[in-house]
């Protein structure tokens, strides 16, 4: 295959000519997409791949890899079009001064399709990230495999997947979906730690609407099938729905601020002034829990009161809203938050909530981030739909995640902690280090109404006034069992505290656990109930 012809007017036999030729080639690499293709990209409200990379990284920090790489294929006339870069921008730079590897697929060149050289460039930057111990951020905007290059495209996809797996739990991996991502291409983002999508711009699916209509007869739009809203609210594939591309890039930067560069590093710390006295803001929690156990409250209020500056970066916000997960800081140090949300399905655990929380706990554990758990859970959601879809196996994932975690685990029971859900939500029995309860906590096998109906069924049937008798027995049950004190007597909770003391108690607990060392039995790997 012949080299690129020398531009007219450049004498490459002189040093000046060689430098001029280099500048020409580099300029072509930076403008690989045609003006028409770039204009179409901008008309859709989308940046080009290079614009995205430069917007994401610190100014002047980008170091590009393989800028002059070109494909080697001669099939179907490809030899007549060999743009520099081959449709993907790769390299490394910094975000807030910390090293980050990045690749961005360029839809203006071959529709961002993945061929041999394209794939090799991504593999190289992933290898660099793993070797140097820095996060890798992938910006996806691609038409899929480059059909003209045949099976070699599929081979490079698998090479990328393998590296996603090998890097899992070693370096943070974040995928930004900023356009189409279809077919086999979706599996690389699915293997990463966080997937971010852009509203009305991003689409992910294995098979598109046309194929689905042909095979099943279903009619569905791109947005309904695999849009950002669908994957954030229904499938749970995505962790954030951005309003536009800049919002997506900013959320990725925010995520990185909570994550260490790799599993051997500690998360970044921001120095703050320690406050170990109870403040007026802390005292607001003393009146948060309603007198009625059936009245909801917003768990975000509790979360905000214990975090620095009430800053909480929630992930997976629209999926399984009955459980809340996200990142914050306590004394400038990152923590992961897992909390039941009484405002949604009364905070019950279902399949989606269990898997959402399990994944988050395991992510925190992989990257040395302590987990704070706030518990108000009446149990697992009942119903044939849950049972037939595998709540036993899939709910066990959350139990597994807590039991295998070796990072500091601090649990606060604010109200209900019933049945198996009490065990699953970061209980002392699964290995939590510090377990606290508010005086409003109700720790029991089940709620008072259900317990009374089972324990006193005959007495209620024989009573002349079953409603009054049931009310009396419910009160007796609540006074006797539905409280935190039996658990405290047995050491299942380490202390019953005023709600206003929560922040200070968490600060003290995390300080004490800062040098925690825990080991698990040697094994190749566990067999999580997938």
Predicted regions mapped to residue ranges:
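Ligand-binding clefts of soluble mixed alpha/beta catalytic domains
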Residues: 1-530
């Amino acid at each position: 295959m012949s080299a690129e012809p020398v531009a007219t007017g450049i004498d490459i036999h002189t040093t000046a000519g060689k430098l001029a030729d280099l500048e020409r080639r580099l300029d072509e690499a930076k403008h690989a997409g045609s003006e028409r293709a770039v204009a179409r990209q901008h008309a859709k409200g989308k940046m080009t791949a290079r614009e995205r990379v430069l917007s994401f990284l610190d100014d002047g920090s980008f170091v590009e890899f393989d800028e002059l790489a070109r494909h080697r294929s001669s099939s179907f006339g490809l030899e007549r079009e060999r743009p520099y870069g081959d449709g993907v921008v790769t390299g490394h730079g910094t975000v807030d001064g910390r090293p980050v590897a990045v690749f961005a697929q360029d839809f203006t060149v071959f529709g961002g399709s993945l061929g041999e050289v394209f794939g090799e460039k991504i593999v190289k930057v992933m290898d660099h990230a793993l070797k140097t111990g820095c996060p890798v951020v992938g910006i996806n905007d691609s038409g899929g495999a480059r059909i003209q290059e045949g099976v070699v495209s599929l081979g490079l996809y698998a090479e990328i997947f393998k590296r996603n797996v090998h890097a899992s739990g070693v370096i943070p991996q974040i995928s930004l979906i900023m356009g189409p991502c279809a077919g086999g291409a979706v599996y690389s983002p699915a293997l990463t730690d966080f997937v971010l999508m852009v509203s009305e711009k991003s689409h992910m699916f294995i098979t598109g609407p046309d194929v689905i209509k042909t095979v099943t007869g279903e009619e569905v739009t791109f947005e309904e099938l695999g849009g950002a809203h669908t994957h954030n609210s229904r499938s749970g594939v995505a962790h954030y729905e951005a309003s536009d591309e800049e919002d997506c890039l900013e959320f990725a930067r925010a995520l990185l601020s909570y994550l260490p560069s790799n599993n051997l590093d500690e998360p970044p710390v921001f120095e703050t002034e320690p406050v170990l006295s109870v403040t007026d803001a802390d005292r607001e929690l003393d009146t948060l829990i309603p007198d009625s156990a059936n009245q909801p409250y917003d768990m975000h209020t509790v979360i905000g009161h214990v975090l620095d500056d009430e800053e909480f970066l929630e992930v997976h916000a629209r999926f399984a809203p009955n459980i809340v997960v996200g990142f914050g800081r306590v004394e400038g140090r990152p923590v992961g938050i897992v909390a039941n949300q009484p405002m949604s399905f009364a905070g019950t655990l279902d399949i989606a909530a269990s898997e959402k929380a399990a994944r988050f706990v395991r992510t925190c554990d992989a990257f040395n981030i302590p987990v704070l758990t706030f518990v108000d859970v009446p149990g697992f959601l009942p119903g044939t739909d849950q049972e037939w879809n595998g709540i036993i196996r899939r709910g066990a994932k959350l139990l597994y995640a807590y039991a295998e975690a070796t990072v500091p685990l601090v649990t606060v029971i604010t109200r209900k902690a019933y049945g198996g859900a009490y065990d699953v939500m970061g209980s002392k029995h699964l290995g939590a280090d510090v377990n606290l309860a508010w005086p409003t906590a109700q720790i029991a096998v089940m709620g008072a109404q259900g317990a009374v109906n089972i324990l006193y069924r005959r007495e209620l049937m024989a009573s002349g006034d079953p409603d009054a008798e049931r009310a009396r027995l419910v009160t007796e049950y609540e006074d006797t069992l539905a409280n935190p004190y039996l658990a405290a007597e047995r050491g299942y909770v380490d202390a019953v505290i005023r709600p206003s003391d929560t922040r200070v108690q968490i600060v003290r607990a995390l300080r004490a656990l800062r040098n925690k060392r825990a080991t698990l039995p040697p094994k190749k790997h566990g067999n999580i109930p997938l």
